[in-house]
Amino acid sequence: MKVAVIGGTGYAGSYITDELIANNITPRLLVRDGSGSKVLQPDQCEIVIGDVDNDEAVQDTMDDCEAVIYLIALVREFPSKGLTNEKFQFRGSERVANIAQKMGVKRFLLMSALGANPDPDGSKYMQAKHLSEQAIKNTDLDWTIIRPSSLFGDPRGGGRPEFCMMLDQLMLNLVPFPSFLPFPAPSFFTGLNPLDAGNYSLSMIHAKDV
């Protein structure tokens, strides 16, 4: 059995690829030119070089596959470089789903996010996730959408973003706070409350459990 994985070199994708291999399923990965080194078990995978906006590469990736898993999303956008979640998360998943439907692929799995919503004043990341969900639901595919919360676990190199590391880089280093104290972050909109540090819950999931 073969399963196409779009976004298989990313953080969650690397773990999902490992799980497919462990279950004797051959992953066929769509890999951007120059990113082949991010494939952790290349001898156990079939690799197609190309981008998600290249229909021919997408078709080659899904050819003779029983299912496709779409994982692409950008933690940080660079609009000036054309790197946006509208393009890669929403439009990309929409394109892949439409091609999958034409090719007769049986199953489509989309990794969305717990906070996916259409709020125009909210996160563009979550907006794109919501639009992706709607695009998949509007097809005739046998689809499954999963909505994990924040993922954590070993990023295993490759420049893969991981929640705890990003929290340290993007937040802890931005405020003058003693490193030996717990970081109080109950609400980033109402300020910091040192008295309540450590008393707030986060709903997180290890990448291996996705």
Predicted regions span which residues?
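SDR active-site strand-loop-helix element
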Residues: I6, L30, L71-I72, F108-L114, ...
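Conserved glycine-rich Rossmann-like NAD(P)H-binding loop of the short-chain dehydrogenase/reductase
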Residues: I25-R32
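Residues forming the Rossmann-fold NAD(P)(H) cofactor-binding site
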Residues: G13-Y15, F90, H130
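N-terminal Rossmann NAD(P)H-binding glycine-rich loop of SDR-like oxidoreductase domains
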Residues: V3-N23
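Conserved cofactor-binding/catalytic machinery of classical short-chain dehydrogenase/reductase
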Residues: N54, G92-R95, R107, L131-S132, ...
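Rossmann-fold NAD(P)-dependent oxidoreductase module
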Residues: Y15-E19, I99, A135
